[in-house]
């Protein structure tokens, strides 16, 4: 299929900010992909990008295990922009000098522009930027000039405009760099000559054609959860092939209040899709009886979901394709060799090997925020598009310890009150995620002149851009008070409310 847009590729050298670079570029209306630093020059030629960005990274170019790239990339004649480690790598390649700094520089710095190369066109001579480096460039490669300096960094920016090579020691992709977006824009449009052409309207048009070409007259199966990703996948594929799509919705009894009914109403009645609802509450609860360990709960829920889905899928004939809501973030993160497992991933793991489906993953080039935009373009209701991130194990990991029907009801009802009041206060678009959890501890209280010994409910609310890091949300006290009063008065067996004021890190967003 003919490519509809210009592309900038980002080579990943291990920076925690590498996804931000690609996202910033997409926000400009230009498509951007993240690739491992091991990509070859030949593979890049096949992609046919307009320019390349080398990301930052934690290594030293001279250190053991330093990451390098295919040197033939520099012979492609494409504009290259090196950020932090990327600039140091470029310096090393062209014979400049990189040394260990006297002390690691981390935080804001004032940048002074000394040479107005295309990268700094129409930008102020002084600007605040974000530094995060242990090495620095101390000697320019031949043919390069100093573009910018800072107090601790005599070569904070450099360029060889004859070869369209640029480097900066700071991180323009981070919002703390006040003109960072403009600087990246200057590279994308001013240096690479890109045109805007990446938007959801074009994406839908191209993706619908791709789905029709791939599927032909065959049938597609989709596991529908009611979450944003699976909902957008289902609606997009249904728009492409109509009744050739069948969705299976498994109600495992761990959903939020009104969620199961809402899914059936929206997709079966609203979009007129073929949705098979499976009531598996009893099956899941029997498997979870007496289980307290959070990892064990996750595995049981994940495995049982696969078995239920497998049972239902085997009843259907002629299903050739399986649709999944894999996002670009999932692909990028699954390729990170150094990532540690903090907890099993929320999404259900691999399907049984004997399920011989071909995969369709229409969202695998999109970030989460782009999926929401796509959902709105497809006419999916706001309550689904802006639905709170919800883990695959559902309320099962918001009841700490053993799961019982009574505990589930407490979390379900308290969570419904929290969501209702947050929406009433107009905070639902400001807060990334908010929910209640039941830590399993009881405390003494007094209600109606009588002593009580009931459960404590925890409220968790965080602000974030992508969920990788998060800060606790500063919900107004009067709103918190209203939520607390309502939960204690309306939810049985609760006499105390606590608010979680821990950021991520050190805590994770979910409690289990």
From Swiss-Prot:
Keyword flag Transmembrane helix: no
Pfam hit, one: NAD_synthase
InterPro entries per record: Class_I_gatase-like (IPR029062), GATASE (IPR017926), GMP_synth_C (IPR001674), GMP_synth_GATase (IPR004739), GMP_synthase (IPR022955), GMPS_ATP_PPase_dom (IPR025777), NAD/GMP_synthase (IPR022310), Rossmann-like_a/b/a_fold (IPR014729)
GMPS ATP-PPase domain mapped to chain residues: 198-387
Residues the entry annotates as binding ATP: 225-231
Disulfide pairings: none
Domain of life assignment: Bacteria
Enzyme class: ligase
Functional summary from the UniProt entry: Catalyzes the synthesis of GMP from XMP.
UniProt cross-references to HAMAP family, sorted A to Z: GMP_synthase
NCBIfam families: guaA_Cterm (TIGR00884), guaA_Nterm (TIGR00888), PRK00074.1 (NF000848)
Protein name: GMP synthase [glutamine-hydrolyzing]
Native source organism of the sequence: Bacillus cereus (strain ATCC 10987 / NRS 248)
């Amino acid at each position: 299929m003919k490519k509809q847009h210009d592309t900038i590729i980002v080579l990943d050298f291990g920076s925690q900010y590498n996804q931000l670079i690609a996202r910033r570029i997409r926000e400009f209306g230009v498509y951007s992909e993240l690739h491992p630093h091991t990509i070859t020059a030949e593979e890049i030629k096949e992609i046919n990008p307009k320019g390349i960005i080398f990301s930052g990274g934690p290594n030293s170019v001279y250190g053991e295990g330093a990451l390098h790239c295919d040197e033939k990339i520099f012979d492609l004649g494409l504009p290259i922009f090196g950020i932090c480690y990327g600039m140091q790598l470029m310096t090393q390649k062209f014979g400049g000098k990189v040394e260990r700094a006297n002390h690691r520089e981390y935080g804001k710095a004032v940048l002074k522009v000394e040479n107005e190369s295309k990268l700094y066109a129409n930008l102020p001579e002084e600007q605040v930027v974000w530094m995060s480096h242990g090495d620095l460039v101390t000697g320019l490669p031949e043919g390069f000039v100093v573009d910018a300096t800072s107090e601790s960094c005599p070569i904070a920016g450099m360029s060889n405009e004859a070869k369209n090579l640029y480097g900066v020691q700071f991180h323009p992709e981070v919002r703390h760099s006040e003109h960072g977006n403009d600087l990246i824009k200057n590279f994308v449009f001013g240096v690479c000559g890109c045109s805007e052409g990446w938007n959801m309207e074009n994406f839908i048009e191209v993706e619908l054609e791709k789905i029709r070409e791939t599927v032909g007259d065959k049938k597609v199966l989709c596991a529908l959860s009611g979450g944003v990703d699976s909902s957008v996948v289902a609606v997009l594929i249904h728009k492409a092939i109509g009744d050739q799509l069948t969705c299976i919705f498994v109600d495992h009894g761990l959903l939020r209040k009104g969620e199961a009914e809402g899914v059936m109403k929206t997709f079966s009645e609203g979009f007129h899709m073929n949705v098979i609802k499976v009531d598996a509450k009893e099956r899941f609860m029997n498997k979870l009886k007496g289980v307290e360990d959070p990892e064990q709960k996750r595995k049981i829920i994940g495995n049982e979901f696969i078995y239920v889905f497998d049972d239902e899928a085997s009843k259907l004939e002629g299903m050739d394709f399986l649709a999944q809501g894999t996002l670009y973030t999932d692909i990028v993160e699954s390729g990170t060799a150094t990532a540690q497992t903090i907890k099993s991933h929320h999404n259900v793991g691999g399907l049984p090997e004997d399920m011989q489906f071909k995969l369709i993953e229409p969202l695998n080039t999109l970030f989460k925020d782009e999926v929401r935009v796509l959902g709105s373009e497809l006419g999916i209701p706001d309550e689904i598009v802006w639905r709170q991130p919800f883990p695959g194990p559902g309320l099962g990991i918001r009841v700490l310890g053993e799961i019982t029907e009574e505990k589930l009801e407490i979390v379900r009802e308290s969570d419904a009150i929290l969501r209702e009041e947050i929406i009433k206060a107009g905070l639902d678009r400001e807060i990334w995620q908010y929910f209640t959890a039941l830590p399993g501890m009881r405390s003494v209280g007094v209600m109606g002149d009588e002593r009580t010994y009931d459960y404590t409910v925890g409220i968790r609310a965080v602000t974030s851009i992508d969920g990788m890091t998060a800060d606790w949300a500063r919900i107004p006290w009067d709103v918190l008070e209203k939520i607390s009063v309502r939960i204690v008065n309306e939810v049985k067996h609760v006499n105390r409310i606590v608010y979680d004021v821990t950021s991520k890190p050190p805590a994770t967003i979910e409690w289990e």
